């Protein structure tokens, strides 16, 4: 896995302390795109997507504005959010989303928004203005160029800190052809002793 670019900033003035600023979100993501060059396209994007009535439409509008000119009905940007399936992980939400994205890129399979029953009408109206972004409710294969897949992840803090990261990952198929594996080096298997307590054994944790 390689981090191609990232940015963190404060979103500036908004309606209230917790209200997001869509223009700032858009500028943040566009700044990362400029860092990594415009010819690298995301296969998918892990949105912040908290399920709030105010925040989700603002984020959806910003994403649609960014990717409207870049995507089409045959190559839409696939959007998902871990929170739709597991709830909000608070301080760990950004890391959890990044891990989910890396696994999706590695396996070239998009995780569905399994608990999605109905879109916030304001999110729907934003995304339905174009076919640039879609919200899959079934697992699906990512559109990508072998041997790597690229994706982005957004994470927004309670008080206005916003972050976006773009990463590129070798697919499982490409790694198999290269004879590599995703198992850690033996010395790294005991680097996280506090995590091992959640598995019945160390081997089970890394399986």
Task: Label each residue range with its predicted role.
Residues 1-205:
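Condensing-enzyme catalytic core of the thiolase-fold
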């Amino acid at each position: 896995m390689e981090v191609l670019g990232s940015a963190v900033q404060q979103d500036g003035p908004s309606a209230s302390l917790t209200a997001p600023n869509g223009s700032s979100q858009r500028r943040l993501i566009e700044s990362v795109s400029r860092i990594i060059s415009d010819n690298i396209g995301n296969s998918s994007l892990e949105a912040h997507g908290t399920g709030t009535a105010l925040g989700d439409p603002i984020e959806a509008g910003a994403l649609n504005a960014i990717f409207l000119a870049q995507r089409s009905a045959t190559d839409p940007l696939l959007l998902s959010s871990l929170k739709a399936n597991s709830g909000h992980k608070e301080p760990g939400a950004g890391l959890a989303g990044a891990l989910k994205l890396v696994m999706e890129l590695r396996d070239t399979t998009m995780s569905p928004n399994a608990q999605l029953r109905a879109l916030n009408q304001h999110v729907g109206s934003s995304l339905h203005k174009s076919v640039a972004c879609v919200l899959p409710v079934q697992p699906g294969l990512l559109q990508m160029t072998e041997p790597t897949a690229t994706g982005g992840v957004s994470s927004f803090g309670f008080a206005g800190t916003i972050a976006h990261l773009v990463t590129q990952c070798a697919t499982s198929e490409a790694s198999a052809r290269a004879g590599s594996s995703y198992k850690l080096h033996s010395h790294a298997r005991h680097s996280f002793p506090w995590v091992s307590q959640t598995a019945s054994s160390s081997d089970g944790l890394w399986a």
